Every structure is written in structure tokens, then in C-alpha cells.
């Protein structure tokens, strides 16, 4: 499916179907959007369930991308998280990874070449998280890996079991240049989320596994975790770090 785009005032709208162009224009004025439920609202991100033309969708804004100076500066040279996600996931779905929840629309506003604000709209899916469907969750993740990509936050809350099977959410669908991130996906599921991983799958204990395991242990180091929490707290207080 081809991604179309159009300028609208200060915004650039990217969409898959013409019907979403009008939604994109409405997103430039948040007061016109029918917000059904806000799932998350912080200085870091915004996630909400919205209604448009009698259908439900999920609206997200990666605020961290444009509130942290170094990340905002980097958008001079990048397409941004929202547009990258739209392109990556659309390509992966075209290649058969229909388990990925479909992104439908992106709106981006830039000033001086840097992203000032952006939103992405996904289809809405209902179901339960993957905790009771570990095997199907692992199979969906391994299908991602087979296409040369990785999830990046491989935990049950990002896999939704629906009446149509497993759906994958909250990923940018980035390319895995080496197996490191793919090994890290499964280590995250095993070490952080479930107690009986070996019932469902086996780790491929190669060089990349051991490197990913070392990285996981580094990130779980108490000192590193304290530094991350301190930085998050200060950013939420308005510090530009």
C-alpha cells in the first residue's frame, strides 16, 4: 500500500487512504478530535482512544522526541519516530506481517527543520494482553525476527490476543542490522516478564545472545537504574537533559 502525503498549513500529512486525510487535518486542531479515553498523558508521550466517522482508533504522540533538545536537534536529519513507524510497519505488513497493528496516518509539524509536534494514528484492536498466550506471542515475535526486524519492548502488554489472533503493538519495526536486538527481545520476555520461558522456546546461545545478556545485566544495574530514574524525574520537571 502506497503512502500519500500532502501539505496542510504548517503540517505535513502522510496517509494510506483518502478518508484519513480529513482526520489528519482535524488533528492540527486538537479541540475538534473526539477523544473517547486517554490511556496515557505525560511530558514523555500521549496515547488516547479517539472516534472518527463512527470508528475507533488509537492516537499517539512521541513527545520525548521534541522536548529533549538533543533528540529534537537530531530530527533535522531524521524523518521522526511517527513517520519512520508508518513507513516501517506498512512495509512489513505488505511483506506479510499482518500481526502488526496498522498505522494509518501521521501528521508532522516542523520549525527550522526540526520536529515541533507529531502524531500517529493506528487501527484500534480489542482483546487481552499476551500473558495467557505466550506461545502465540513468541511465534509472532519470531515472525518479526524472520523478516529482519525486532520489537524493542518485548513484553506481554505489547501483544494483544484478539478474536482474529495475535496483534503486535508499540513497535517502530526497526531493521535489525545484527541479531543482537532480536536476542534482546527474547531475553526481555524471559528475564523480565515470565518464569517458564523454556516451556515455549529456547534461546539461541550464540555470541549475540551473550552480548545481549550482558547488555540486559548492565541496564538492570542498580546504579544505572537510579541514574535513569533521576534523569526521567528531572526531565519531567522541565530540565533539558
Which residues does each PLM region occupy?
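Juxta-kinase regulatory segment immediately upstream of eukaryotic protein kinase catalytic domains
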Residues: 1-37, 225-240
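ATP-binding glycine-rich loop module of kinase domains
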Residues: 34-37, 43-83
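Short hydrophobic-acidic sequence motifs that mark active-site Asp/Glu residues
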Residues: 49, 56-60, 121, 168, ...
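Conserved structural core of kinase catalytic domains
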Residues: 78-83, 90-93, 100-135
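Protein kinase catalytic-loop region centered on the HRD/HxD motif
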Residues: 143-149
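Catalytic-loop of the protein kinase fold
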Residues: 149-156
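C-lobe/activation-segment region of protein kinase-like
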Residues: 150, 165-241
